[in-house]
């Protein structure tokens, strides 16, 4: 996930056939087992993908990591602006995702679970998913 969307997804789906079967994998810092986070990710995908393609999509959400010290100036600035905006929100307005961002700001965090790739591999290996 990048700035609330799946980077490049909107342009990618424009090139697909109307009945294309696709796998969408999101990777972000948000807890992928938190229903509110899942709902927010799905809303973002719904804005980027036409319904006819979404109906044939298999969607997975994975957690990634971030090392703030390795971000370029543009992204460090974006993160600083976002952090300064959300840290002053009232507690009842802070989502789990926002709280996690505040807690991990300016740190190196790694939530990567390579075992989570197994479910994606399983779907890819199911020939029926991509049979014409």
Residue ranges and their predicted role:
Residues 4-132:
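FMN-binding flavodoxin-like domain, especially the glycine-rich phosphate-binding loop
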